[in-house]
Amino acid sequence: MFLVTVLSTDLAAKCHHYGDESEDFQLTCWLKCGDWRLALRPPGVELSDSVATDILVSYKRATEAVQRSSSSSYRAFHSWALMNFRLAEQISGNEKIRAGTSMANKSPTVINTHVIVAVKGFVQAISVGTKRWSASVQQDMLNLLSCLFKYGELQNVSTTINDGMDSIEMEAWLGVLPQLLARIHIKSQAIRSVLHSLLIRLGTKHPQALMYPLSVLLKSPVVERKVAAESLMNSLKAHSNALVEEALMVSSELIRVAILWLELWHEGLEDASRLYYGEGNVSGMLDVLIPLHAQLEKGASTRREQEFLKSFGRDLLDAHNHIKDYVRLITDSGQIIPTQGGFMSPNQAVRSGSPANAEAEAALNQAWDLYYTVFRRINKQLPGLTTLELNQCSPALFNARNLELGVPGSYRVDGSYIKIQRFIADVHVITSKQRPRKIAIRGNDGKDYVFLLKGHEDLRQDERVMQLFGLVNALLARDRRTNTHDLSIQRYAIAPLSHNAGVVGWVPHCDTLHCLIRDYREANQIPLNAENREMLALAPNYDSLTVMQKVELFTESLERTRGKGNDLYEVLWIKSTNRYVRMLVHFHDNFSFDFITFNYFTCPVRNGWSGGQISLDHLP
């Protein structure tokens, strides 16, 4: 540590010595001096005032050297801004611990100074980095947004950011568009003003980039977010009205194709049944069922919906009437609809002692008799849902021709994109748990673009992960230690349509690991569920075993299965170009395998790595 300190001091002295002869060398020296001093403090360790001052002085002189130098150093402004931002975070964190008060009372002068300097530094770095297409620009954009969202209410911070926007190319903001739109309903008027002004300017120059994301926000259950999105969409209508109308139509119709009424009611009845019978939450049950009934009352718009009403409309109408009777009886008796302990069997309702309670529970039981009948009939029909005709489930998409709207994921920073010519009429339903659709869109370039249309899932998190992967790929490509090792992460287009639907770009030449094992076993005449058969034969009471007993049982069943559970290894060894197989420590059967590049990936991404976030209600 002492040696590094001496070297950094000597280097600083050389900066003065070479100052008149080489400004470029002086710039490099001050940057190294700051980097070395910062490297002496491990990440996460608080910087003392003296150390922070020394580092700031080094980076400050580096930025001053840039103005006298012939080179435009991105790193000087980046390091200077990042250091000030780190100190602002450190001071505000300490003040929170000491005082526990609001941000407005936390050393406002010191924090304000560091944040404003950081904002100016990030703006300069982004301006220089954008021109050089630096891979770190997106990091600076995110840090700049952090300054706005965390400290935008401090004096002059939002004004400084607003003034600096003219120095940043509009295209740079496209990389952080999801972060911008996620905060459009922020309460602070100062921050919201900056944000909305930026988005309006961005929409004027790049309206295509905002179409799909804004259509998602228009369907948000959060009222403030929906209102803010409507305001932005209205500003876009002033110059791109036809485009806005097309985007709204395509988004809503794709959701209609992704989740048919048949599936909507299947999922709704399943959730309502769990709330009522499992938790006794009648209020939650009604929150699920009433919107579904309200949708039916609006009438059918497609042939598929007409067939649904013809098959189930009468029973669902009767069930809805029983639900209304229940609500009326409970309300008239002055009671509150229960959120727990609300389920009563018919015998319990009779013994409850209250005629109103007994009558209300009887109405609810009658409704559930009808719901159960509908659910069983839907359950029988769903396995036969393998193909869809677009003219039956969405005539609007079937008839759409030569749209101004771009194919999802085709928009580029330079403003180029592929317009939608038409939607291919045949839609294939993949027979997995959520029954996603395989759809194709023909672009105005004559090519067909294939997508996976997913319902019942929120793809906004996956969109953020793809954004992260793009940044990682850029950093890997920039570093000379990694750019020759083909370490890039496979990415694909993701366009959320609402909080429970979206489209995912189709990656060709791929199959899931489950399909690889299935095909291998079929070719070798091994039952697909061979291990399961062996386990049940050895221990019919499998569910009552301890965890270790289950592990031992599974190990024994693998030993008794032909191939001893090495099916995946065998099939990958056969397909490998160099007979070398490197396995993942953790994977599941939704992982896909690319036959051309021999890469793994998963869709959606969060399925592979967010096990702690999976809701137990949706586990098999």
What are these regions (language model features)?
Residues 1, 26-35, 75-78, 139-142:
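Short amphipathic alpha-helices enriched at the N-terminus of pentatricopeptide repeats
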Residues 3, 7, 24-29, 41, ...:
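Intrinsically disordered, low-complexity N-terminal extensions of nucleic-acid-metabolism proteins
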Residues 5-19, 30, 52-66, 115, ...:
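Hydrophobic/aromatic packing residues within the alpha-helices of TPR/SEL1-like helical repeat arrays
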Residues 20, 24, 31, 67-71, ...:
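Short coil turns that delineate tetratricopeptide repeat
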Residues 62-65, 72-472, 476-490, 499:
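Regulatory N- and C-terminal appendages and interdomain linkers associated
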Residues 399-620:
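Conserved ATP-binding subdomain of kinase catalytic cores across diverse folds
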